[in-house]
């Protein structure tokens, strides 16, 4: 028995030693963090003030663009350092070291797509000095915050660099046009997709949240008061790496913008400057091609191209994966590259992927040039860079110009092959090398109707029918989408049906709560209404409720809960390509859920649909694919907690004299992570009430509304007026 005890003790000691060895060896293999004193000293080169308005929104004011970028990095870190840190770790391929195995696929994709080979090779050659100075200043702001708050910093993060910002664009932008869906097709049915849902935006999951948005521009000719108006209304997750943060930047070098920012980026991604503005929505062109490779049966390290065997380019991806606590294991996986692009080996063979934007580090440059454009010509010059590989753009400016672009880095492809299918991988003439010029992209400028819109729908419905683009004018090789959304139909039925849009109507139409009779939802709803209820009392009652439903989603509506809980799962399954359940089964599930949790099958929609933040719980109207977009996550009590949809909303107006005003609202507030802050949820009541607040764009507008005025690292000084530069 004594020998058994000694043996067991020895085994424990060996295991403990192995764990200690893994922990120590992993830490030794990582570079030493920089001296915090050096990061703090770097801050001395910047002259900037952060002025928080009464909603906590930061206004960053400095003499140079670099000063403002530094202040933005610091201010955003004050409110959401955890997410900025997560973004940096993800784009470096280091997320699994903190998040565990669920993030290993993301880390592998960073290697597979050669994110850092691209950034390191092209950062200095392809990005001008003025931009690099801004990128590095933003990174200095993040580092300064981290140095002052070392307890919040994950080991290995520092220093954050300008290259991290660039890598974020290089890695993330292809997922906005559906690269993840193409990867999913190549994996097993049990595989996942890169999710855009909240804090898990970089993790593999098979239940991504819907991506949707609205953008509308109205010209003076269609406005009752001769104004030019722009709606900025992206539907995003409420939290996480692709959630919106509001700020105003004001540089003495002309970088003066207000709008929405993502964690880890110094640039306004959509919003306005003094002269012009734009809104983005996600589009769905075919920008990814998949090639089935012929692998040498005698040598798995080769593939055939034009009758010759070529060697795969091979490298090793070392992925550090958190196992438990501080224990990190280094996993290794082979990375293959062919002439077409990255290679994935699956049970069905080896496939190469070629996608728009690969190898391009210039998205940051395009965003910076868009931010500083002073007129339509400069803005279009920035768009001609074609470095942002997708997204719809709806534009408006102080001169009354409006426009719509179905933006994309469209490959120049041969006519004939089925580019939306799997292509033969042994023909080099199917490997495209260039993009369709910007001026050949689908776009509409200053149409006779005086309005343009997009709600993730086809570009062939973007204005009044007489001014719409024609499908026959574009090559099928562009892969332009032809689908419509409910929001697209409702835009046509509201903005498109009103020849003289007032300021009030422009606002009211944005908060439209109805499903169009032409929508997919209405078609599925018709299937549900056709269910034979027979003698089933529940089905008969449900049929009566649904028959009287007006297809609206007001908080007091007593048909919306039953209808949406029935039709939304059916639509989701069909969109996902899954075998949908029978409508009667979906209806029975909705009935059971509502009876169990609410004691009736016709509760008010606001009892079910909730906006929650900390201890706050508010009824909210709207729903899936509604212009007032709200996507909820089912809770154990049967309610839905809004997780995505309407978030940061902005209304921009230039009156007929060109004077700018704008209003905005955020679903929560500027304090992303601090529940003790008064700005953690102070905008939520306004948000659910469809109200907005003024954007204090100029120093004169901001004066008298300043809650805090400080240099980075010196917060606490209260001011009542604007600070000088």
Model regions and ranges:
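C-terminal/peripheral segments of proteins
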Residues: 2-527, 532-535, 541-725
């Amino acid at each position: 028995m004594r020998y058994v005890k000694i043996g067991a003790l020895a085994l424990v000691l060996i295991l403990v030693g192995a764990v200690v060895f893994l922990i120590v060896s992993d830490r030794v293999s990582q570079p030493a963090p920089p001296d915090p004193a050096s990061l703090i000293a770097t801050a001395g080169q910047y002259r900037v003030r952060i002025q928080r308005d009464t909603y906590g929104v930061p206004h960053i004011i400095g003499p140079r663009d670099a000063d403002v970028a530094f202040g933005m990095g610091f201010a955003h870190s004050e409110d959401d350092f955890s997410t900025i840190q997560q973004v940096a770790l993800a784009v470096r391929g280091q997320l699994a070291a903190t998040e565990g195995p669920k993030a290993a696929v993301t880390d592998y994709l960073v290697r597979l797509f050669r994110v850092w080979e691209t950034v390191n090779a092209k950062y200095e050659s392809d990005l001008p000095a003025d931009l690099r100075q801004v990128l590095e200043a933003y990174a200095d702001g993040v580092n300064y915050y981290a140095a002052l708050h070392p307890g919040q910093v994950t080991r290995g993060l520092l220093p954050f660099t300008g290259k991290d910002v660039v890598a974020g664009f290089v890695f993330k932008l292809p997922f906005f046009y559906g690269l993840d869906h193409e990867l999913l097709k190549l994996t097993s049915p049990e595989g996942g997709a890169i999710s855009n849902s909240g804090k898990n935006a970089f993790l593999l999951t098979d239940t991504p949240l819907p991506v949707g948005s609205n953008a509308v521009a109205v010209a003076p000719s269609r406005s009752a008061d001769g104004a030019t108006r722009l709606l900025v209304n992206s539907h995003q997750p409420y939290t996480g790496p692709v959630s919106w943060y509001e700020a105003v930047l004001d540089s003495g070098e002309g970088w003066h913008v207000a709008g929405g920012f993502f964690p880890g980026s110094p640039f306004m991604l959509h919003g306005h400057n003094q002269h012009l503005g734009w809104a983005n929505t996600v589009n769905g062109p075919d920008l990814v091609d998949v090639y089935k490779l012929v692998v040498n049966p005698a040598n798995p390290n080769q593939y055939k191209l034009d009758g010759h065997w070529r060697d795969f380019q091979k490298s090793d991806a070392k992925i550090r994966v958190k196992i438990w606590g501080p224990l990190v294991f280094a996993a290794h996986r082979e990375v293959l590259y062919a002439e077409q692009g990255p290679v994935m080996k699956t049970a069905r063979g080896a496939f190469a992927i070629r996608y728009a934007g690969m190898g391009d580090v210039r998205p940051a440059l395009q965003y910076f040039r868009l931010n500083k454009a002073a007129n339509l010509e400069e803005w279009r010059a920035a768009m001609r860079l074609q470095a942002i590989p997708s997204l719809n753009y709806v534009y408006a400016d102080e001169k009354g110009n409006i426009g719509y672009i179905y933006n994309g880095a469209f490959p120049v492809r041969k006519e004939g092959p089925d580019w939306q299918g799997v292509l033969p991988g042994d023909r080099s003439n199917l490997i495209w090398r260039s993009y369709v010029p910007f001026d050949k992209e689908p776009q509409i400028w200053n149409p006779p109707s005086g309005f343009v819109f997009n709600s993730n729908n086809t570009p062939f419905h973007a204005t009044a029918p007489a001014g719409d683009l024609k499908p026959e004018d574009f090559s099928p090789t562009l892969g332009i989408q032809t689908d419509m959304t409910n929001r697209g139909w409702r835009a046509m039925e509201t903005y498109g049906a009103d020849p003289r849009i007032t300021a009030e109507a422009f606002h009211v139409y944005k908060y439209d709560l109805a499903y169009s009779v032409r929508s997919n939802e209405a078609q599925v709803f018709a299937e549900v209404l056709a269910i034979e209820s027979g003698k089933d009392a529940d089905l008969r009652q449900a049929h009566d409720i649904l028959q009287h439903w007006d297809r609206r989603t007001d908080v007091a509506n007593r048909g919306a809960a039953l209808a949406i809980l029935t039709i939304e799962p059916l639509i989701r399954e069909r969109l996902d390509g899954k075998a949908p359940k029978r409508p009667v089964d979906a209806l029975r599930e909705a009935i059971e859920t509502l009876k169990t949790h609410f004691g009736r099958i016709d509760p008010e929609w606001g009892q079910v649909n909730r906006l929650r933040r900390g201890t706050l719980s508010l009824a909210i109207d709207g729903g899936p694919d509604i212009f007032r977009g709200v996507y909820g996550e089912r809770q154990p009590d049967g309610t839905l907690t809004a997780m995505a949809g309407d978030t940061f909303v902005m209304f921009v107006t230039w009156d007929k004299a060109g004077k700018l005003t704008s209003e905005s609202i955020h679903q929560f507030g500027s304090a992303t992570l601090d529940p003790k802050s008064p700005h953690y949820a102070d905008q939520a009541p306004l948000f659910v009430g469809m109200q907005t607040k003024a954007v204090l764009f100029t120093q004169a507008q901001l004066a008298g509304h300043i809650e805090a005025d400080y240099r980075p690292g010196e917060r606490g000084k209260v001011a009542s007026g604007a600070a000088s530069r």
